[in-house]
From Swiss-Prot:
Coiled-coil region list: none
HAMAP family: RecO
Name of this protein: DNA repair protein RecO
Source organism (scientific name): Chlorobium limicola (strain DSM 245 / NBRC 103803 / 6330)
InterPro entries registered for this protein in UniProt: ARFGAP/RecO, DNA_rep/recomb_RecO_N, NA-bd_OB-fold, RecO, RecO_C
Pfam families assigned: RecO_C, RecO_N
Amino acid sequence: MIVKTRAVVLREIKYRDQSKICTLFTSEFGKLTAILKGGRNPKSRLSGKFSAGNVLDIVLYKKNGRDIQLISDGSLLFSPLSAEPDMERFATMYRIIDLISQALEGEEKNLPLFSLLTGVLEILYSTEERFELLFIWFLLRMISTLGFEPSLDRCVYSGEPLSAAAETMMLRELSFVMNPGGVALPAAALRQISQQHSITMPAYRLLSELSSTPLSALDEVDAGKAETEFLCKLLQEYCRLHLDHTPRNRNLAVVAQMLSK
């Protein structure tokens, strides 16, 4: 059966002399594996189009029950190479597609997650800075879409409004609880044994603001470097815990190598 769908390339590996096998996240069929015959041949009209992070409209020969589908055609929509080369942009891209790959279970359609991914990648490939802030914004929406959104407005234990309580008690920090996910007042968190991290009030306010800021207004957010870096690490850890397995070493090694240069 010949089908058309939009797709994001999550991974590509060499196959034989000139072909490649791609892991794709598609709008219509979820995550699937497909072969691009002759895709590494420089003379092929599809050469270079099916690279990690690229977003395309594709044509597949799809057969139910077959493990590997066949790519027939593809039209590139946007790519990390469409902007000036930037190692931080590539590092952010690999973080995003790695987490998406972990979150997907086979050929299960997930249009909200697909729309989130393509929307964020389009912005990522067209912006020149604040990649980490965009990554935090993405993480918050991804965990919400997947159903493990942390409680940010009220204490995850007592239910008290966090901002009002923090102001009344003149708190300098709160606690971010990994499971159940959410932010807690220090007094309530002390009585629990769950894994948790201290979060400063500036970091909490940034987290809360990003949770309600639309993507179109992200440039208006005032974010400190320390708070941004902290939230990146915190939310990645939170995602890994709730996705119930660790990131693929291959993509994380690529990220580490990029950021060290």
